[in-house]
Amino acid sequence: MLKLRQLQQQKQQQLAKNAGSSVKANTNSTSPAKLRLQKDIEELELPPTVRVNIISLDNHKEMSLNIIIIPDEGFYKGGKFRFTATFLETYPIDPPKVICNNKIFHPNIDPHGKICLNILREDWSPALDLQCIVLGLLSLFQEPNGNDPLNKEAAEVLNKDKLEFGNLVRLAMSGAMVGSTYYECVI
């Protein structure tokens, strides 16, 4: 897998070649949101448990990234969880839309992929960046929060019996039914 900086440099070279102009001239016509996201990507320092792949930075209305979290500790250790982050032209004024692409048994992620992470809602600030988003997603797996749930069933078990919660997480991660919901294998 190419490193993000190499991928970005290749993309800039390709854009410059296609436009018949320098990278610097091409950057001047780029939207503020795209420039900010490119800066965020350049400055990104990923822990070994996280990967980020660029889906598209060329779309004029939105830019998308895949974020893969592979926790190395806690209840979700060994799982591979995929997220899509979509950045609109209003980024960084507005937060990106982030969804989980896997159906997982987690108190802060509902079965449809909606995520309960304050920095993606009311605590968002333009000072936050892609690094903060990645660390926020990683924290969901290190410290799931049963007091602010989207998945009430998972939150109830977490708050009541952490050992049982761990057993149900393992069962769900292996691709099984928990309660009335089937969770896909992410191990």
Curated annotation (Swiss-Prot):
Residues 19-32 have a biased composition (Polar residues). Gene3D superfamilies: Ubiquitin Conjugating Enzyme. Residues 32-178 form the UBC core domain. This is NEDD8-conjugating enzyme UBC12. It is an enzyme of class 2 (transferase). It catalyses: [E1 NEDD8-activating enzyme]-S-[NEDD8 protein]-yl-L-cysteine + [E2 NEDD8-conjugating enzyme]-L-cysteine = [E1 NEDD8-activating enzyme]-L-cysteine + [E2 NEDD8-conjugating enzyme]-S-[NEDD8-protein]-yl-L-cysteine. Pathway: Protein modification; protein neddylation. GO terms for biological process: protein neddylation. The active site is at 116 (glycyl thioester intermediate). Accepts the ubiquitin-like protein NEDD8/RUB1 from the UBA3-ULA1 E1 complex and catalyzes its covalent attachment to other proteins. Pfam families: UQ_con. It comes from the Eukaryota. The keyword Nucleotide-binding applies. Keywords: ATP-binding, Nucleotide-binding, Transferase, Ubl conjugation pathway. It comes from Candida glabrata (strain ATCC 2001 / BCRC 20586 / JCM 3761 / NBRC 0622 / NRRL Y-65 / CBS 138) (Yeast). Its EC number is 2.3.2.34. InterPro entries: Ub_conjugating_enzyme, UBQ-conjugat_E2_core, UBQ-conjugating_AS, UBQ-conjugating_enzyme/RWD. Belongs to the ubiquitin-conjugating enzyme family. UBC12 subfamily. The gene is UBC12. Residues 11-34 are annotated as: Disordered. Disulfide bonds: none annotated. GO terms for molecular function: ATP binding; NEDD8 conjugating enzyme activity.
